[in-house]
Amino acid sequence: MNIAFLPVRCGSKSIPFKNIKSFCGKPLLYWSVKALQESNSIDEIFIGTDCNEIKDVVKDFNFSKVKIFNRSKENARDTSSTESVILEFINKMNFNSLDVFFLVQATSPLVRSIDFDKAYAQYKKEAYDSLLTCVRTKRFFWQD
């Protein structure tokens, strides 16, 4: 099974509730979840949150693959690492060793379903044990 996990908090200090603020007419979180929902490579999508507002917004998406993972308050603090909530999720769920885990950021609204499908195809083809996506950035766009 291919499982996507999005850790999402309400408690951002810089932009409170940023993950559910409107971005192009939908909550920011919507765009990543929609891409996962439409991906042929994803079986289940888990939103890891302790925030009732986020839970309500996600339920309103009405996506068939989406489930809520109730992360602990301890792993929803400003000082909590992404790794700690991933470990909490993996330890509480009943996965098997053949399951594939996708960590997805809610703050990546430009990701598309084909991006997940291509990444998964490459992961399988090359028999990798992990895959990380990134973008090359340039300080000045006019430089090569």
What are these regions (language model features)?
Residues 15-38:
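Short, well-formed alpha-helical segments that are part of the catalytic scaffolds
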Residues 73, 106-108:
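Short acidic donor-binding/metal-coordinating loop in glycosyltransferase active sites
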Residues 1, 43-45, 99, 129:
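Residues at the starts of beta-strands that form the adenosine-phosphate
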